[in-house]
Amino acid sequence: LMAKDVTDGKSKDAGITKKMTVYTSAESHYSIPKNAAFMGIGREQVRYITANDLGEMQPAELEKAISDDIAAGYTPFFVNVTAGTTVLGAFDDIEAIHKICKKYHLWLHVDGAYCGGVIFSEKYNHLVKGIELSDSFSFNAHKMLGTPLTCSIIVTKHKEALYKSFSNDAEYLYQTDGDDFNLGKTSIQCGRRNDALKLWTLWKSVGNKGIEDMVNQQFYLADVARKYVQEHPDYELYSFENSISVCFNYKNIPAADLCTRLYEKAATLVGFGKFRETEFVRLITINANNTEEDILRFFKVLEENSSL
């Protein structure tokens, strides 16, 4: 919404009159086209950029799509970079994509809903190198940081854009001048729950080191799971290092069938995902309270309950 209003300052009052286009990875979250529909941009104006073999958006393909749209009379305005794709947990190259956004004067957003918590880890924050170059960044503390639902944060370097896009005068509200703490002026909601308290209490409770340890533990557990898969010939690994999504298949059993069996036997609950034409079991090590023993027990339970 901020990106739209920055690109077309009249659209907030007069409505959208330009053919505006959005760019995102083909592996990004479904909320991108959903929000394009809500805003009146239209799902058909979302351009899905192909990913490489690691699931990362390809900058060269992005620039080509932008250039082609400009030539066709469209108005590109927003590029979404994903920090932790839903299936593979891939991180798009922020720095490379920022250069393209700067060249074409586009708003760069980093969607860190899933794995944006890596900003708290000295060991893994390189995965979002260049995040300070973005115009906005969002992450869900109820994912990697484990706060209660819902606790979502958006950060932008354009404070004035928040006010221009979300403020709306009402005589019976906002009667104090200069109230920077009144989020009704800078967000869609007016009345709202104090969701920020969830992150604040966690931070006060465990501190920077505690949050960093939580994030690092999730990657450690993923390493444990990947090592197990790699060392056992009945498994085939489909994911990669530096991801908390561990994707694999077992004994060539269709992933959907295997996950359904485990669920129906009340053995364990794990989901499945798909990248390109391959479907696989998708183990997410996002619970920092788990241990190495819990991960190894998961595989034992899976193996014992995999047959019909």
List the model feature ranges, each with a label.
Residues 275-308:
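PLP-dependent enzyme catalytic core of the Aspartate aminotransferase-like
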Residues 1-161:
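Conserved PLP-enzyme active-site core in the AAT-like
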Residues 36, 101, 229-230, 262-263:
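A generic structural signal for well-ordered alpha-helical segments
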Residues 235-262:
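Conserved PLP-binding catalytic core of the aspartate aminotransferase-like
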